[in-house]
Regions:
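Formylglycine-dependent sulfatase
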Residues: 1-257
Length: 257
């Protein structure tokens, strides 16, 4: 089995296993201790859409068509997305008998035929682009005509402007359910967190618990989520035959933090 846990805008030094003195990440630290730290792990681009396209396809963004001089990332009103002729990790594994699930931020197209379920994923639950791309979350002039942020289940919008403080918890519940539901067959889970991209939100139980303010709270909730995924693998007897990779799309957006 394969599990990729993917964060948005997390910095190299935001984890205690990489030297952060105040943010506690015991579950991710355990992964680093029991597995390996990938210290020369390059992203395809320094922003979200092309980096994610590179991850999904194994191709440079300039070749998969999702990087250009005028627009670096897709927006809610973008008319394009990852092309149907691109071969994704999910598509290859699906064709070879794997159950495939995507949870969280996609950012490779906000509508069909560009959604995860159009690119080899059996199921999808999440927000199709960055959490600041709505007039509710972004007061910039460019966002005035953006639609409300949709929460999508497979190919259908089920909510508008979901409570972002509950996203990490809800994503985690879906990820754990996917693991349990497919514990008797090979699976690929792509779990792409919305955070710590700004604006920052965390569940009430994590507010004020870190020594690094709201940003630290958000990262520590993500670490809790990693622990829940690892626990689900262990409890279902999958921890010895599952590759788990924890990484991010690019470095931090320092001015926003």
């Amino acid at each position: 089995n394969f599990v990729i846990i993917f964060c948005d805008d997390m910095g190299y030094g935001d984890l205690s296993c990489y030297g952060n003195p105040t943010i506690r990440t015991p579950n991710i630290d355990r992964m680093a201790c029991e597995g390996m730290k990938l210290t020369q792990y390059y992203v395809g681009a320094g922003v979200s859409t092309p980096s994610r396209a590179a991850l999904m396809t194994g191709r440079l963004p300039v070749r998969n068509g999702l990087y250009g001089d005028r627009v670096a990332v897709l927006f809610p009103n973008s008319k394009a997305g990852l092309g149907q002729d691109e071969v994704t990790i999910a598509k290859v594994l699906q064709q070879n008998g794997y159950a495939t699930g995507c949870v969280g931020k996609w950012h490779l197209g906000a509508f069909s035929p560009y959604l995860p379920t159009d690119h080899g994923f059996d199921t999808y639950f999440g927000i199709p682009y960055s959490n600041d791309m709505s007039p509710v979350q972004n007061k910039g002039a460019h966002a005035r005509n953006f639609p409300s942020t949709p929460l999508i289940l497979d190919g259908k919008q089920i909510e508008s402007e979901p409570d972002q403080g509950e996203l990490t918890r809800r994503y985690t519940e879906k990820a754990v359910s996917f693991i349990k539901d497919h514990s008797k067959e090979p699976f690929f889970l792509y779990f792409a967190h919305t955070f710590p991209h700004i604006p920052l939100y965390t569940n009430a139980r994590f507010e004020g618990t870190s020594k690094r303010g709201l940003y630290g709270d958000v990262v520590e909730e993500i670490d809790w989520s990693v622990g829940e995924v690892l626990k689900a693998l262990r409890e279902n007897g999958l921890d010895e035959n599952t590759f788990v990779i924890f990484t991010r799309d690019n470095g931090p957006w320092l001015t926003g933090h």
